[in-house]
Amino acid sequence: MAEKITSRAQDYSQWYIDIVRFAKLADYSDVRGCMVIRPNGYAIWEKMQAALDRMFKETGHVNAYFPLFIPESFIQKEAEHIEGFAPECAVVTHGGGEELQEKLYVRPTSETIIWSSYKKWIQSYRDLPILINQWANVVRWEMRTRLFLRTTEFLWQEGHTAHATETEAKEEVLRMIEVYRHFAEEYMAIPVIVGMKTESEKFAGAHETFCIEAMMQDGKALQAGTSHHLGQNFAKAFDCKFQTKDGSLEYVWASSWGVSTRLIGALIMAHSDDKGLVLPPKLASRQAVIVPILKGDKAAVLEKAVELEKMLKAAGVQVFLDDSEQNTPGWKFAEYELQGIPVRIELGPRDVAAGKCVVARRDTSEKETLEIDTAFPQKIKDLLDSIQTGLFERALRFREEKTKVVTTYEELKAQVEVGFAVAHWDGTPETEAKIKEETKATIRCLPVSKDFATKYGINTEGKCVFSGNPSKQMVVFAKAY
């Protein structure tokens, strides 16, 4: 029940854990660092999968599946890649009761195993581009774990594409980060900053990494998706060449991009409150619940409740009727608030007699009485749209309130305690590392979002907030998950 939840003001970390557990989204596993995604949590992931998969296919991608196990020799082919992932890898040394001749790495990411196949599939420019996505699980041996945000095993999608030119590969990288931005803002109702990672923060083995960064309610950043320009690194590692139109041989250009179940963590931390989970309707598997108040003429109330359920389902609303009598209506109200059901419809004997019902919205807790007529389903759909829009606008207002341009190092140190600091940086890894060491804040990205860049004057010259050296562009500093 909702009263068990620790308040955000009291302990934000415990509040998050309480919501994950009490809303029955996930639970701890007996396997260290792993989690059990419960039906309520998996239903959100299925909604995310469906929306993203549709967008991937609309942009020309197809799904495939590659092995979970990767030979050690494959991992070692790309030096930067293995250096970046080796500490996180789980390694299989025995199988069938015997020591393996070659160790097998449990997939931390799939570039190497996929490019071993691409080498076989690509001979000519006619074989390009290859636009493949994979839905899979990956394993990274995390030392400090938190449900959804950082676990040893997690679910994700990873896109891997092969192209004839660098221009095409770069276009793919930017196309897919835009897909992620659209998904975050239109489905998750979370405003994000699109940007490029610094050299020290980019993906191991990439030329460039683009990202979307979101702000959580404690002012910290969460990287919600990445898209990598891999250049020809993996093609060279696997000697993957193609014959061009003029007959010459060239290495293939590549991209990779991915999001994971940490998006569920982002969803929780961006919107939820001290009563429990708050879900944007587009990602809620149950958008509305009908709670009949079964006293007086129970039969009439139930009959009208069933009629309402049919009306709403026919209109495409994902609604369910809770006509159980084990729990009181008040218990149900609190429970469905905790579970984040966007709309609650209350129906009692007086409502039935008046031809009306009470409708409560989860995001603001506002209630209104609506006529039960032919327009009722559309009113509920409009309400769901209003909740979706309202959540985004509220999150955007919050981010803007917690984002500040700073011109001194003292200002930066104070600002990263509450939100995002936009500041000039001299472009050196030494300055970046020193700021991280002293403040625990990292450069989240070099923003490329036009609206954000314009609002905060990103592309202006100035002096580095730390060193005082010349700076060509401002960046976003924040503490992060």
UniProtKB/Swiss-Prot annotation:
One of its GO terms (cellular component) is cytoplasm. Pfam families: HGTP_anticodon, ProRS-C_1, tRNA-synt_2b. One of its GO terms (molecular function) is ATP binding. One of its GO terms (biological process) is prolyl-tRNA aminoacylation. It is an enzyme of class 6 (ligase). Coiled coil: none annotated. InterPro entries: aa-tRNA-synt_IIb, aa-tRNA-synth_II, aa-tRNA-synth_II/BPL/LPL, Anticodon-bd, Anticodon-bd_dom_sf, Pro-tRNA-ligase_IIa, Pro-tRNA-ligase_IIa_arc-type, Pro-tRNA_ligase_II_C. Keywords: Aminoacyl-tRNA synthetase, ATP-binding, Cytoplasm, Ligase, Nucleotide-binding, Protein biosynthesis. Its EC number is 6.1.1.15. It catalyses: tRNA(Pro) + L-proline + ATP = L-prolyl-tRNA(Pro) + AMP + diphosphate. CDD domains: ProRS_anticodon_zinc (cd00862), ProRS_core_arch_euk (cd00778). Its main location: cytoplasm. Catalyzes the attachment of proline to tRNA(Pro) in a two-step reaction: proline is first activated by ATP to form Pro-AMP and then transferred to the acceptor end of tRNA(Pro). Consists of three domains: the N-terminal catalytic domain, the anticodon-binding domain and the C-terminal extension. This is Proline--tRNA ligase. It comes from Chloroherpeton thalassium (strain ATCC 35110 / GB-78).
